[in-house]
């Protein structure tokens, strides 16, 4: 005979405890997409709110050590993606969620990424008015970078034909939506700059959702627009749509048709200039407001940590930038090597033996002419100096003195007679005249008492 099964009898507290354990063990952590409502942020720093959809709702708590990692400020009515654990509040028998992380869902996440990239590029100066290039007036050729199958191209061509049918237009096809679009837009801008056949570019597309327009919020596209040597007019979506490309471009047009109006010639040129100045003022105002928002954002989130996805995006962007810089450095080195090779060939040709021999022959001829001329001048100078020395020597010769009527008297021992004390009566003297000698004998010596008349020669 079968024994009756004794039923398990629970108390309320044990039941709630068992249910809590089952929920925590079986469910673990889950991801939940829902809308925030009844958000409460008391002074304790914890967050309490309700997550709901159109049919149900559940209470949720997010403690301070978890919500400090949230990179945005949640608000009622906002769609979010929450990672949470399920638990049961045993004393009341209510189950709730304990949130570990939170991020915007759908367009909210894209908007957060948009603001982060905008702040970073703005801090780098890519939005500065000083970098804006003036549009040509009038434009000689217009380039259009957009999809060939979109309505934007049709609108641009229609306006250009209506306003200035003779204006040349070059189309650079590119995808404007999807994963391939940013790369194609970058390559189209680079191609237009390489070919340099247009003096202004229109980059844009028709309207759409934030996700549809996301290619124009790509950092690669923004940097390509900033690096363009050709002025760029952005024309993305409708007037209410704002993209990163609008901030970086030299001028923002609210629609592709408006962009065609701006770049084409019109009878009323003043209107185009007025629109240009208005756009510059709008850009300056947007820049000022963006800086204010950035400052407010910094003050609001200075204790919050950066989201890992943003950090990963920056690393990926840096990797792409380094890759581009490496390619540019390699190209530069190749060009420098080619230039050095050409210069080396020219130097080698200049240093060839035939070239050196011709230079030496020419130099030798120059030296020969210089030597001959210098030798002639030297001989003439030496002849002149020789004549002068001969004249001086002749003037200083004793024979010349004798020829003027003077004489030289010597004693018999050859000593020249200068004073009367050198002789005595009876000494023999020799006097040298111009044409010979005279010998005489001293009979007496007398001192000079008076000056003798000029022309009288003395005698011993």
From Swiss-Prot:
Keywords: Cytoplasm, Exonuclease, Hydrolase, Nuclease. Its EC number is 3.1.11.6. One of its GO terms (biological process) is DNA catabolic process. It catalyses: Exonucleolytic cleavage in either 5'- to 3'- or 3'- to 5'-direction to yield nucleoside 5'-phosphates. GO terms for cellular component: cytoplasm; exodeoxyribonuclease VII complex. The keyword Transferase does not apply. It is found in: Cytoplasm. InterPro entries: Exonuc_VII_L, Exonuc_VII_lsu_C, OB-fold_nuc-bd_dom. The keyword Protease does not apply. One of its GO terms (molecular function) is nucleic acid binding. HAMAP family: Exonuc_7_L (MF_00378). Heterooligomer composed of large and small subunits. Bidirectionally degrades single-stranded DNA into large acid-insoluble oligonucleotides, which are then degraded further into small acid-soluble oligonucleotides. Belongs to the XseA family. This is Exodeoxyribonuclease 7 large subunit.
